[in-house]
Curated annotation (Swiss-Prot):
Source taxonomy: Eukaryota, Fungi, Dikarya, Ascomycota, Taphrinomycotina
NCBIfam families: PRK04301.1, recomb_DMC1
Transmembrane segments: none
Organism of provenance: Schizosaccharomyces pombe (strain 972 / ATCC 24843) (Fission yeast)
Gene Ontology BP terms: chromosome organization involved in meiotic cell cycle; DNA recombinase assembly; DNA strand invasion; meiotic gene conversion; meiotic joint molecule formation; meiotic strand invasion involved in reciprocal meiotic recombination; mitotic recombination; protein homooligomerization
Quaternary structure and partners: Double stacked ring-shaped homooctamer. Interacts with rdh54.
Protein's name in the database: Meiotic recombination protein dmc1
Binding annotation for dsDNA: 223, 229, 235
Record family assignment: Belongs to the RecA family. DMC1 subfamily.
Residues bound to ssDNA: 223, 226, 229, 235, 304
Cellular location(s): Nucleus
Record-listed ATP binding positions: 120-127
Amino acid sequence: MEEFAEGNDDEQMIFSDIEDLTAHGIGMTDIIKLKQAGVCTVQGVHMSTKRFLLKIKGFSEAKVDKLKEAASKMCPANFSTAMEISQNRKKVWSISTGSEALNGILGGGIQSMSITEVFGEFRCGKTQMSHTLCVTAQLPRDMGGAEGKVAFIDTEGTFRPDRIKAIAERFGVDADQAMENIIVSRAYNSEQQMEYITKLGTIFAEDGQYRLLIVDSIMALFRVDYSGRGELSERQQKLNIMLARLNHISEEFNVAVFVTNQVQADPGAAMMFASNDRKPVGGHVMAHASATRLLLRKGRGEERVAKLNDSPDMPEAECSYVITPGGIADVS
């Protein structure tokens, strides 16, 4: 596979480099501090609260006001017409899951500029879908790809290069080049996980070829670091900050954010005779942050079933798929 061309058209380069603020009187010393804090674009400054910016060492209230004013000149906070939003939505693209049936219920695949969450019990295909997307994201657009690189945050130690090789072979992609286009970080606690997400903002700003960010899984480390009801409030606050950052990244750099999530028993569902007695971890904070939510469960034999639980533009629907040596695929 050849190297990807730098994203230099309107579809991909939708952000302004933070160094453009020098034209509005912001010094390079302050810009370096912003980059170290993970704010690498003018849009990033615009999305950041004054409270967050004041936490950066050496930033006074007057300096933050000047910074916000400069960013506002470049990114005015105006209302847009529905027609303008419709035009902006044309920048959104989808990445194939490897299954046409699954792509169908998702409206084409995993969308950019939003968070897609898949949840389910073990052996349903969450990690296998993550590996499949690592390869399909690199495919040409006419094959359901996004022609770009992938960032993968592994919180459970389940990333396997051998799976990338097998999936690349299925799609006719050079395995070595496919692996070169994937960067992986292994997080061991929730603070490190947030650190990596912040660092990716800098990486995406410097290299406009990234199209997909995967976190597998989003809640695993939070469940370890925060245990018991006494720490639940703090956990949800930290989770909310992380998800807000992921949403900012997805819109700032027009990338697809794909997160896997674990499930927990739901005793209330059993009492109500509900068909599914499992619910995703993370509560309402997780539910509100994810634009698209997909439930994966075991079906008959080797089949798996995906149910679209929540989507802003697609109705609830189900489909079957299988896990093959070449990744997620349709039932034959």
